[in-house]
Amino acid sequence: MKLNTNSNSYIIIYSAILVVIVAFLLAFVYQALKPMQDANVALDVKKQILYSLNIRNLDGAEAEAKYAEVVKSESEQNGQKVYQCSVDGQRVLVVSLKGMGLWGGISGYLAVGSDGKVFGAYFNHESETAGLGAEIKDSQEWQEKFIGKKIFDEQGNVVLSVVKKVDDPQTQVDCVTGATLTSNGVNDMIHDGLRPVMNEIQNAVRESLTETSNDSTAVAE
């Protein structure tokens, strides 16, 4: 019996078989590539953390090695990831940040030095406007404006902020030109991200001060 390739039943069966084959191939390719994709995502996170520690321009292998050298532990405090790091003998806490910009999600890592000031910062975005809001990621110069800024006051309140006009250069950073709403998102993200881990940051600063005092006493003796 000759197969009627023009019949509706043939077309439906043929199409169904093709769909099954394509779906199988896509699933196979996805599973085959997933470990590589996961590794790339993990490496990107490590690089962003290193950027916040002012360690940049490393290739994949170098970044992996440097991350293993400086990041001593990772924990989660009140829903916030905190990385305990050591850079040139200085204890540094890196806090992960997530928030909303003008057009989508934004994220970042803020490194806190043992003096309670910003050691470094790195920010990322999903869909901010190139040349405007995207500068939170693309402008290393803007990120470096955070370095040395005071993070909290004597009462433990977060005072680090991104503002349109700087009145207090010790705690404030100029917003990105032409991107006030994205900058406001960065400001909110910093405050929302730091509040849950403020106790840990303050404890780390106190411990560092105690260690410094003990070292000074030991040298004097």
Regions picked out by a protein language model, each given a short descriptive name:
Residues 2-221:
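Flexible, solvent-exposed loop/hinge segments and secondary-structure transition points
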